[in-house]
């Protein structure tokens, strides 16, 4: 299994022209991915049991996001905060945030491969919450980007993946309190 892990991540380097993936059949790669994917689902995602071990980390990071956003929005000037993270940490955050594809429950272990795909998050990732102020002080919209791609959120959208900050703040405050 360790050779599989090296093989699937080795292609991201330009150090060697050899493919370690050639050591496996297509069926072996699929079976090993399903094991690896299930491991991440159980450890970093919603898991089969609704209480998963990494949840508190995701809640902590989400709380920090929300706290910093509240601070920044109180200022009367543009503010930028950059956030980067490793794939395993980001999976936990995406799950806690209830993002589509990261928080869907599996019916059983064999269903995990249908609702969770650990390869959808690169080893190095970034999250951006971009805020747009309207004419009124409390008229604020937010749009979420994951690795520079617009990401849907579990709230009622206003237009194409824009959300009212008051809805996002209330929803994620509830998640933080429950965590």
Segments the model singles out, each with a brief description of its role:
Residues 1-81, 85-179:
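Signature for phosphate-centric chemistry
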